[in-house]
Amino acid sequence: MNEQTYLLASAVEPVAAENMSWTQTLVLSVVQGLTEFLPISSSGHLRIISELFWGADAGASFTAVVQLGTEAAVLVYFAREIWQILTGWFAGVFNKDRRGRDYKMGWMIIVATIPVVVLGVLGKDLIRDALRNMWITATVLVLFSFVFILAEKVGKKDRGYDELNMRDALVMGFAQCLALIPGVSRSGGTISAGLFMGLNREVAAKFSFLLAIPAVLGSGLYSLPDAFDPSTGQAASGLQLTIGTLVAFLVGYASIAWLMKFVANHSFSWFAAYRIPAGLLVMLLLWLGYLNP
């Protein structure tokens, strides 16, 4: 092989992804569990912390797979409600006389999931590459905080769980698409939409978590093969992904329990008070060169 041929082969040969360390895996899994359900953006925090302490992006595939642990926490925490919705939906499908509240709730979740599935599949490359820019993450952390504040001030917050309808579900479903941008927060986008629609905080949070189940489980399973040998980001072993998912589950369950109690008596504006200085700090670190975009 002459020199020109060698250089050409080297240029087109894919570069092997850097392997993640166990420390990085465990830390990021804890961060995932803590931030997935809080409206502060889990993907944004994973991106920031991974870049700040390890100088590399863990990648969207790792994030999607470890999210399976936090969604398992939702399945366990809301097991009774999920079982009621599933049985009610299947019963209604085969028997028109049994089409009650749970049957309708099942359809609301299904229909509201469609927008993020379509956008997620069509925009896969954009999500994994262009949008994972630290400047975008930091800017969105700051700007979207004002959406929380506005939702708290504008929303009446007087509608209960039984008052949820298909319009609410669709609005929250489209809001879930914003979560594809690191820095927005899946729960932040959907809960804010619920508040704008007049839902009370507990109902908005509960439906937000239920709505995330199909999309996150689908994304995690879809990204599972790529997590071992990603085109972007870092590679993790099967054992690392398994332990990371378990850690995210345990921490995520505790996070859900805390948030459901917190929202009963506290405004979501408290999270804006964290997001704004956090985003500004990341901008400063980027400007000083301590973080890579």
From Swiss-Prot:
One of its GO terms (molecular function) is undecaprenyl-diphosphatase activity. It is found in: Cell membrane. This is Undecaprenyl-diphosphatase. HAMAP family: Undec_diphosphatase. The gene is uppP. It comes from the Bacteria. Belongs to the UppP family. Its EC number is 3.6.1.27. It comes from Corynebacterium efficiens (strain DSM 44549 / YS-314 / AJ 12310 / JCM 11189 / NBRC 100395).
